[in-house]
Protein backbone atom coordinates (compact mmCIF):
# COMPACT_ATOMS: atom_id res chain seq x y z
CA UNK A 1 0.00 0.00 0.00
CA UNK A 2 1.27 3.47 -0.88
CA UNK A 3 0.97 6.02 1.93
CA UNK A 4 1.88 9.67 1.45
CA UNK A 5 3.07 11.05 4.79
CA UNK A 6 3.85 14.71 5.43
CA UNK A 7 6.47 16.09 7.78
CA UNK A 8 9.45 18.44 7.86
CA UNK A 9 12.84 17.12 6.78
CA UNK A 10 13.75 13.71 8.23
CA UNK A 11 17.42 14.72 8.34
CA UNK A 12 18.23 15.64 11.98
CA UNK A 13 21.03 17.89 10.73
CA UNK A 14 18.45 20.04 8.94
CA UNK A 15 15.53 19.88 11.32
CA UNK A 16 14.95 19.09 14.99
CA UNK A 17 11.27 18.19 15.09
CA UNK A 18 9.06 15.89 17.10
CA UNK A 19 6.90 15.35 14.01
CA UNK A 20 9.96 14.33 12.00
CA UNK A 21 10.96 11.87 14.74
CA UNK A 22 7.48 10.35 14.85
CA UNK A 23 7.37 10.12 11.06
CA UNK A 24 10.76 8.42 10.91
CA UNK A 25 9.62 5.98 13.61
CA UNK A 26 6.43 5.14 11.69
CA UNK A 27 8.29 4.56 8.43
CA UNK A 28 11.05 2.49 10.06
CA UNK A 29 8.63 0.23 11.93
CA UNK A 30 6.06 -0.35 9.20
CA UNK A 31 8.12 -1.85 6.40
CA UNK A 32 5.17 -3.69 4.85
CA UNK A 33 3.78 -0.37 3.61
CA UNK A 34 5.37 1.88 1.02
CA UNK A 35 5.66 5.29 2.65
CA UNK A 36 6.19 8.30 0.38
CA UNK A 37 7.57 11.20 2.39
CA UNK A 38 6.36 14.63 1.32
CA UNK A 39 8.57 17.24 2.96
CA UNK A 40 6.48 20.12 4.27
CA UNK A 41 7.73 22.66 6.79
CA UNK A 42 10.78 24.85 6.96
CA UNK A 43 14.23 23.68 7.96
CA UNK A 44 15.69 25.08 11.16
CA UNK A 45 17.96 27.55 9.33
CA UNK A 46 15.37 28.71 6.79
CA UNK A 47 13.92 32.20 7.06
CA UNK A 48 10.30 32.43 8.14
CA UNK A 49 7.55 34.96 7.58
CA UNK A 50 7.00 36.42 4.12
CA UNK A 51 10.20 34.77 2.89
CA UNK A 52 8.32 31.47 2.92
CA UNK A 53 5.64 32.42 0.37
CA UNK A 54 7.56 31.50 -2.84
CA UNK A 55 8.64 28.19 -1.28
CA UNK A 56 5.06 27.41 -0.24
CA UNK A 57 3.72 28.12 -3.73
CA UNK A 58 6.32 25.72 -5.09
CA UNK A 59 5.39 23.11 -2.46
CA UNK A 60 1.71 23.41 -3.33
CA UNK A 61 2.50 22.60 -6.96
CA UNK A 62 4.64 19.65 -5.84
CA UNK A 63 1.74 18.46 -3.66
CA UNK A 64 -0.62 18.41 -6.63
CA UNK A 65 1.98 16.51 -8.64
CA UNK A 66 2.56 14.00 -5.82
CA UNK A 67 -1.15 13.22 -5.57
CA UNK A 68 -1.45 12.90 -9.35
CA UNK A 69 1.51 10.49 -9.53
CA UNK A 70 0.07 8.27 -6.77
CA UNK A 71 -3.71 8.28 -7.29
CA UNK A 72 -4.32 5.25 -5.06
CA UNK A 73 -2.16 6.34 -2.12
CA UNK A 74 -3.81 7.20 1.17
CA UNK A 75 -2.60 10.30 2.99
CA UNK A 76 -1.21 10.55 6.53
CA UNK A 77 -1.23 14.30 7.15
CA UNK A 78 0.73 15.49 10.18
CA UNK A 79 -0.89 18.65 11.54
CA UNK A 80 0.61 20.71 14.39
CA UNK A 81 -1.66 23.42 15.75
CA UNK A 82 0.81 26.26 15.36
CA UNK A 83 0.20 29.54 13.54
CA UNK A 84 2.38 28.69 10.49
CA UNK A 85 0.69 25.31 10.14
CA UNK A 86 -2.82 26.70 10.53
CA UNK A 87 -2.15 29.22 7.77
CA UNK A 88 -0.55 26.64 5.45
CA UNK A 89 -1.92 23.16 5.93
CA UNK A 90 -5.67 23.67 5.34
CA UNK A 91 -4.89 24.54 1.70
CA UNK A 92 -3.00 21.28 1.20
CA UNK A 93 -5.62 19.21 3.04
CA UNK A 94 -8.47 20.90 1.17
CA UNK A 95 -6.94 20.02 -2.19
CA UNK A 96 -6.67 16.37 -1.13
CA UNK A 97 -10.23 16.01 0.15
CA UNK A 98 -11.65 17.89 -2.83
CA UNK A 99 -9.98 15.23 -4.97
CA UNK A 100 -11.74 12.56 -2.91
CA UNK A 101 -8.52 11.20 -1.44
CA UNK A 102 -8.54 8.97 1.64
CA UNK A 103 -6.78 10.90 4.37
CA UNK A 104 -6.17 10.74 8.11
CA UNK A 105 -5.09 13.87 9.94
CA UNK A 106 -2.58 13.28 12.74
CA UNK A 107 -2.79 16.18 15.22
CA UNK A 108 0.45 16.93 17.07
CA UNK A 109 -0.62 19.41 19.71
CA UNK A 110 0.84 22.87 19.35
CA UNK A 111 0.33 26.23 20.98
CA UNK A 112 -3.32 26.61 19.96
CA UNK A 113 -4.53 23.22 21.14
CA UNK A 114 -4.89 24.32 24.76
CA UNK A 115 -4.46 28.10 24.50
CA UNK A 116 -7.14 29.89 26.54
CA UNK A 117 -7.41 32.56 23.83
CA UNK A 118 -7.14 31.91 20.10
CA UNK A 119 -7.28 34.80 17.60
CA UNK A 120 -10.63 34.81 15.84
CA UNK A 121 -9.33 34.10 12.34
CA UNK A 122 -7.27 31.12 13.56
CA UNK A 123 -10.20 29.77 15.57
CA UNK A 124 -12.39 29.88 12.46
CA UNK A 125 -9.74 27.97 10.52
CA UNK A 126 -9.52 25.31 13.24
CA UNK A 127 -13.28 24.85 13.45
CA UNK A 128 -13.46 24.62 9.67
CA UNK A 129 -10.75 21.93 9.49
CA UNK A 130 -12.12 19.88 12.39
CA UNK A 131 -15.63 20.22 11.02
CA UNK A 132 -14.66 18.19 7.94
CA UNK A 133 -15.70 14.56 7.60
CA UNK A 134 -12.20 13.21 8.23
CA UNK A 135 -10.65 10.87 10.80
CA UNK A 136 -8.35 12.65 13.25
CA UNK A 137 -5.64 11.03 15.39
CA UNK A 138 -4.58 12.66 18.66
CA UNK A 139 -1.99 11.67 21.24
CA UNK A 140 -4.10 11.61 24.41
CA UNK A 141 -7.69 11.34 25.63
CA UNK A 142 -7.45 14.93 26.86
CA UNK A 143 -6.67 16.10 23.33
CA UNK A 144 -9.59 14.05 22.03
CA UNK A 145 -11.94 15.81 24.43
CA UNK A 146 -10.60 19.22 23.38
CA UNK A 147 -11.09 18.55 19.67
CA UNK A 148 -14.62 17.23 20.10
CA UNK A 149 -15.87 19.72 22.70
CA UNK A 150 -14.06 22.90 21.68
CA UNK A 151 -13.67 22.52 17.93
CA UNK A 152 -16.52 20.21 16.96
CA UNK A 153 -14.52 17.27 15.60
CA UNK A 154 -16.63 14.11 15.27
CA UNK A 155 -14.28 11.28 14.29
CA UNK A 156 -11.32 11.37 16.70
CA UNK A 157 -9.13 8.44 17.77
CA UNK A 158 -6.70 8.65 20.69
CA UNK A 159 -3.31 6.92 20.38
CA UNK A 160 -1.40 7.87 23.56
CA UNK A 161 2.29 8.46 22.95
CA UNK A 162 3.55 8.60 26.55
CA UNK A 163 4.78 5.91 28.90
CA UNK A 164 2.40 4.17 31.29
CA UNK A 165 2.70 5.98 34.62
CA UNK A 166 0.73 3.46 36.69
CA UNK A 167 3.93 2.34 38.42
CA UNK A 168 4.50 5.90 39.62
CA UNK A 169 1.60 5.51 42.06
CA UNK A 170 3.60 2.87 43.90
CA UNK A 171 6.53 5.24 44.43
CA UNK A 172 6.88 5.96 48.16
CA UNK A 173 9.22 8.26 49.95
CA UNK A 174 10.58 5.63 52.31
CA UNK A 175 11.72 3.54 49.35
CA UNK A 176 14.13 6.23 48.22
CA UNK A 177 17.60 6.31 49.69
CA UNK A 178 18.56 9.90 50.40
CA UNK A 179 22.08 9.50 49.12
CA UNK A 180 23.42 12.80 47.80
CA UNK A 181 25.99 10.91 45.76
CA UNK A 182 23.22 9.12 43.86
CA UNK A 183 20.49 11.66 43.19
CA UNK A 184 17.44 10.93 41.10
CA UNK A 185 18.30 11.73 37.47
CA UNK A 186 15.61 13.45 35.41
CA UNK A 187 16.23 13.65 31.67
CA UNK A 188 14.52 16.02 29.24
CA UNK A 189 14.98 15.56 25.50
CA UNK A 190 13.19 18.07 23.32
CA UNK A 191 12.85 21.65 22.18
CA UNK A 192 12.87 24.26 24.95
CA UNK A 193 9.49 25.94 24.50
CA UNK A 194 6.70 26.99 26.90
CA UNK A 195 4.20 24.58 25.31
CA UNK A 196 6.53 21.59 25.71
CA UNK A 197 5.81 21.09 29.40
CA UNK A 198 8.41 23.46 30.83
CA UNK A 199 5.99 24.76 33.47
CA UNK A 200 5.05 21.23 34.56
CA UNK A 201 8.73 20.24 34.71
CA UNK A 202 9.52 23.27 36.87
CA UNK A 203 6.65 22.49 39.26
CA UNK A 204 7.81 18.86 39.56
CA UNK A 205 11.37 19.93 40.36
CA UNK A 206 10.14 22.46 42.93
CA UNK A 207 8.11 19.74 44.61
CA UNK A 208 11.08 17.37 44.72
CA UNK A 209 13.22 20.09 46.25
CA UNK A 210 10.55 20.96 48.81
CA UNK A 211 10.27 17.30 49.83
CA UNK A 212 14.09 17.07 50.01
CA UNK A 213 14.56 14.49 47.29
CA UNK A 214 18.04 14.76 45.80
CA UNK A 215 17.79 15.02 42.03
CA UNK A 216 19.69 16.13 38.95
CA UNK A 217 17.95 17.58 35.90
CA UNK A 218 19.67 16.85 32.60
CA UNK A 219 18.50 18.82 29.55
Show where each model-derived region lies:
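N-terminal subdomain of nucleotide-sugar transferases
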Residues: 1-44, 70, 206
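Conserved donor-binding/catalytic core segment of Leloir-type glycosyltransferases
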Residues: 4-6, 175-196, 201-205, 217-218
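A short, basic/aromatic alpha-helical/loop segment that forms part
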Residues: 13, 83, 168, 193-198
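A short, histidine- and acid-enriched strand-loop-helix "catalytic/donor-clamping" loop
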Residues: 80-84, 101-120, 135
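Nucleotide-sugar donor phosphate/pyrophosphate-binding loop at the beta->alpha transition
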Residues: 88, 111-128, 165, 169
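Donor nucleotide-sugar binding/catalytic pocket of nucleotide-sugar-dependent glycosyltransferases
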Residues: 126-171
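Membrane-proximal helix-turn-helix segments that form the acceptor-binding/catalytic region
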Residues: 92-99, 119-135
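Nucleotide-sugar-dependent glycosyltransferase donor-binding/catalytic pocket residues
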Residues: 11-15, 164, 191-194, 207-213
